[in-house]
A protein has these predicted regions:
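Conserved acetyl-CoA pyrophosphate-binding loop and the N-cap/start of the following alpha-helix
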Residues: 80, 84-92
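Residue-level recognition of the GNAT/N-acetyltransferase active site
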Residues: 77, 81, 111
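Short amphipathic alpha-helix that is part of the acyltransferase structural core
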Residues: 1-32, 49
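Conserved beta-strand in the GNAT
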Residues: 47, 53-62, 68-75
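Short loop/turn motifs at secondary-structure junctions and domain boundaries
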Residues: 36-42
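Conserved catalytic-core motifs of GNAT/GCN5-like acyltransferases
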Residues: 105-109, 119, 124-141
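Short hydrophobic/aromatic beta-strand element in the GNAT-like acyltransferase core
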Residues: 43-47, 57, 73, 107, ...
Length: 145
C-alpha cells in the first residue's frame, strides 16, 4: 500500500471511485462539485494504492479564517470497503494535518452510513441535517476532540 499526492493523471480513477459509491453514499448531485474540486490547484489531496490499483482518495483544506481544517472527499472504491484502506488514508491525513497545522480543530461532514467510522477515530457528531446531501442522505457535521 502506498499514498501519494493527487495528480491530474489520477482524475479518471477518482471519478470511478465516486461513481462506485453512488447513490448509497454519495448523491449524484455531488459529482459536479467533486469534479470541480479535483480541477482546483489549491487543494491538499492524496491517493492510496493497494498493490496494483488506486483504491482510495481523500484530502483536507484550511478554512478561510485559518481557524479549522476540514477533511474533504474521503472516498474508498466500493469494491474495497472494509479492507483498512479508509483507516490508513484517514490516519495519514490526520498526521499530515498535525504536522502542518498543529492545534487546529479538525472538522468533517459525512452521512449516516459512515459517521460511526469517524467516531472510532475520536470524531464527535455536532449536528445532523436530515436529507442534507439529498433525499435519504443525512449530513453529519463532526469535530475531532
Amino acid at each position: 500500500m502506498r499514498i501519494e499526492p493527487y495528480d491530474s493523471k489520477h482524475f479518471e480513477n477518482c471519478i470511478e471511485i465516486i461513481q462506485s459509491n453512488t447513490p448509497k453514499y454519495i448523491d449524484p448531485s455531488e459529482h459536479s462539485d467533486y469534479k470541480d474540486y479535483l480541477l482546483r490547484n489549491d487543494k491538499t489531496y492524496f491517493v492510496l494504492f493497494n498493490d496494483f490499483n488506486l483504491v482510495a482518495c481523500g484530502g483536507y483544506g484550511l478554512n478561510k479564517s485559518g481557524a479549522k481544517v476540514v477533511l474533504s472527499w474521503g472516498l474508498v472504491h466500493s469494491q474495497h470497503h472494509n479492507k483498512g484502506y479508509g483507516s490508513e488514508l484517514l490516519k495519514y491525513r490526520l498526521n499530515h494535518i498535525k504536522n502542518n497545522y498543529p492545534d487546529t480543530e479538525i472538522h468533517l461532514d459525512t452521512s449516516q452510513h459512515t459517521y460511526r467510522f469517524f467516531e472510532r477515530f475520536g470524531f464527535n457528531v455536532k449536528q445532523i441535517s436530515k436529507n442534507g446531501y439529498g433525499e435519504g442522505l443525512d449530513k453529519y457535521d463532526m469535530i475531532l476532540k
